[in-house]
Amino acid sequence: GVDPYSASKSSTEIMVRAYRESFFKKTNRIAVSTGRAGNVIGGGDWSPKRLIPDCIKSLRLNKTIFIRNPKFNRPWQLVLEPLKGYLMLALKQYQEPLKYSGAWNFGTKPNSVTDVKTLVNHIINFWGSGKIKIKKNNFYEQQNLQLNIKKAEKYLKWKPTYNIKNSVKMTVEWYFRVLQNKEDPKKVTSDQIDRYIHDS
């Protein structure tokens, strides 16, 4: 992308590649890689000015959800998806450092990219209530973002497990159980990890 956010990601990749090729590749002992995820969602994110936490906060207070750029497409994915990929990559790098050093993407399948409004509608549906209002956006952002995951699929045998609806369902369920049902966050997280391992 040409926006500052996308350019910062590209700059990081260029710098890491330069150091890898200049100082680490010939040693064949230290694996240096970058792993990029899509737009991760999941329970336990309390950061301000982020879509999911803001939605949950509004829903709990029975307030309208304000969104920018409703038609912008993002590769939303449950946070457990790329974490599984990172662990698989770490194991392969330990076994064969030179072969698996490089840049890796752990995103969604091309047909799973979803726009902001659709994502928020899924959140409202699984929560059980809620309203949306479009808010004017004064910041430039890339309209469509997507990661090519073919390399991870081919060489790591990694692939996404959940579609967008299942990812949102798991996310909303975490917040609902913790915030509404007052369940232990650690227990809820453990339950979801077990379910994800079973499903994948």
Where do the language-model regions lie?
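Flexible, glycine-rich beta-alpha linker
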Residues: 1-4, 25-51, 73, 105
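Active-site Tyr-X1-5-Lys
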Residues: 2-33, 56-61
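Conserved donor sugar-nucleotide recognition element shared by glycan-biosynthetic enzymes
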Residues: 4, 12, 48, 116, ...
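A generic local structural motif
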Residues: 19, 52-53, 131-133
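C-terminal substrate-binding subdomain of Rossmann-fold SDR/epimerase-dehydratase oxidoreductases
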Residues: 39, 59-200
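Glycine-rich, phosphate-binding/catalytic loops in enzymes
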Residues: 50-53, 122-124
